[in-house]
Amino acid sequence: MLTQLKTYPKLLKHYEEIKEAHMRDWFSKDKERASRYFVQFESLSLDYSKNRLNDTTLKLLFELANDCSLKEKIEAMFKGEKINTTEKRAVLHTALRSLNDTEILLDNMEVLKSVRSVLKRMRAFSDSVRSGKRLGYTNQVITDIVNIGIGGSDLGALMVCTALKRYGHPRLKMHFVSNVDGTQILDVLEKLNPASTLFIVASKTFSTQETLTNALTARKWFVERSGDEKHIAKHFVAVSTNKEAVQQFGIDEHNMFEFWDFVGGRYSLWSAIGLSIMIYLGKKNFNALLKGAYLMDEHFRNAPFESNLPVLMGLIGVWYINFFQSKSHLIAPYDQYLRHFPKFIQQLDMESNGKRISKKGETIPYDTCPVVWGDMGINAQHAFFQLLHQGTHLIPIDFIASLDKKPNAKGHHEILFSNVLAQAQAFMKGKSYEEALGELLFKGLDKDEAKDLAHHRVFFGNRPSNILLLEKISPSNIGALVALYEHKVFVQGVIWDINSFDQWGVELGKELAVPILQELEGHKSNAYFDSSTKHLIELYKNYNQ
C-alpha cells in the first residue's frame, strides 16, 4: 500500500516544506525551469513546468515508483502475466498494436498470430466497403456506418473517428448509438437508407442489454424496409466472441470479428472494436494509429522515469491526489476534433482506478482516482474556468493542443493557441491584490472603490497544469496520445496497489435492474425493493396504464 512504502513519509515531510511555495517565485528564480521540465517524444511534447514541484519532489516520486517495483510491473504487463488478479487474466491491449516479432504465449495461444489474423480480416472487409465492392441488397454502395455498442465498444471508436475526421472517407457518414433511450437509435435511423447502411453490433458476449436492445430495434427497422430477413447478412456485422448468438441474430459467421478477454473494453479500440475506425479511416491510417500507440508503448517500457511521459504524468497526479488532497482532474483539449476526448478519458481513468480495495483485498486508507471531467477548453473558459481560477478547489488541468493551423481559417488558430498559453500562465502566476489595485487606480477609479473591488480581482494562482502539445491531429499522434493516458492510468494503479483492469462497480446496478424491469413490464418479482424504489415503480406503472 502507498502509505506503507518507505518513501511515503519522506514525501509527506517534503509536502509540508513546499506546500506554501508559489510557482511564480520558482519561475522567477530558475530561468531554466521551463526547459528542464519539458519532454519531447516523437511529435508529442509535455511541458510540466507549471506544477507545484521541484527537483526534490521528482526525486522522491521516482523513489516511490521504485518502491512499488514499477519497472518490473510494466514488464509483467507487456509479457502477458495475469496482472488482472480478480479475473485471472492477462492485460494485453499492447499486443494489439505490437510491431515486434517475438510471440507472446498465453495459455497455449499465440497472441500476436491471433491478433494479426483478425487484423487481416478487418483490412479485407474495410477495403471492400471503402472501395464500393461490398454492396447492399439493392446493389447500392454503403454510405452510412452505424456502430451500436456502449462503454468501451462505443467511446473509443467515437472519439477516434471524430478526432480524425479529416482523414475519413468522403462517402461515408459515421453514426454511433449507445444509449438505450430509444430516442437516439430512432433519430439515427430516420436519416438512413436501409439499402446503403451497414450496422456494426459491438458486444463481446452479444448479450449486453443496451446494445442488443438497440441492435434488435435496428434489425426490425431494416427488415420492415428491406422486406426480407435474408438481407441482414449484407447489412449487419458483429464484433463478438459469441458465434451462436451472432448467427441467431442473422449475421453470417464470416462477418463476425473476434476479440479476447485479455482486452478490456476501455482498452479495445485497437481491436476489432475499432472496425468502424478502420472502415472510416482506411487500413493505412488505422495502421498509423496502431504505430503511434506502439511507439508510446516502447517509450513507456524503455525510457528512464525522468523522461518517461506516462510515468511523469502518473506520478504528478499521485502527488496532487495523495498529498494536496485534490479530488478532481480536468481534461481541456483546445481542438474541436478532440471534443469527445474528455469523456473517453473519463471512462479510461475512473473505470480503471475508481477502486477502494487493494490487490490483497484490504480497504485502502487513501484516495485513489479523482473525478475526471472536461470540455473543449475555449468553451470551458466561458463556463467553469471561473471556479478554477477563483474557487476553493485545487483542480490540476491537462491542456491539450496542436501546433498545426487549420486550412482556410486564417487567424483562428493563433487566437486559440494564445488562449492555451494565457490560461496556463494565469493559473500559474495569478494576480496579487497590489497588482489588481494598481490596475484599477490606473483606470481612474476612486481609491476607496478600487480598494474594495481589488479583492474580487485577485487570482491566487499556483494552480497546476500540464500542457500536452501535438504537432498536428494525425492518426499516429492520436494513437500515441491515447496510449500515453492508458499507461498513466496503469502507473497510478501500481502506486495505489489496485487492479486497474476489472470493473465490478458496474455490476450491482445491472443486477438490481433485472427484477425492476420485470415489475415495469407487468410481471411480479420476488425481489425486495426499498420503499422509495417501490413507490417509483408504482408511479411509473400508474402513469403508463
From Swiss-Prot:
One of its GO terms (biological process) is glucose 6-phosphate metabolic process. Gene3D superfamilies: 1.10.1390.10, Glucose-6-phosphate isomerase like protein, domain 1 (3.40.50.10490). The keyword Ligase does not apply. The active site is at 351 (proton donor), 382, 510. InterPro entries: G6P_Isomerase (IPR001672), G6P_Isomerase_C (IPR023096), Phosphoglucose_isomerase_CS (IPR018189), SIS_dom_sf (IPR046348), SIS_PGI_1 (IPR035476), SIS_PGI_2 (IPR035482). One of its GO terms (cellular component) is cytosol. The keyword Nucleus does not apply. Keywords: Cytoplasm, Gluconeogenesis, Glycolysis, Isomerase. Pathway: Carbohydrate biosynthesis; gluconeogenesis; Carbohydrate degradation; glycolysis; D-glyceraldehyde 3-phosphate and glycerone phosphate from D-glucose: step 2/4. PROSITE patterns: P_GLUCOSE_ISOMERASE_1, P_GLUCOSE_ISOMERASE_2, P_GLUCOSE_ISOMERASE_3. Its main location: cytoplasm. It comes from the Bacteria. Its EC number is 5.3.1.9. One of its GO terms (molecular function) is monosaccharide binding. It is an enzyme of class 5 (isomerase). It is found in: Cytoplasm. It catalyses: alpha-D-glucose 6-phosphate = beta-D-fructose 6-phosphate. Belongs to the GPI family. Catalyzes the reversible isomerization of glucose-6-phosphate to fructose-6-phosphate. This is Glucose-6-phosphate isomerase.
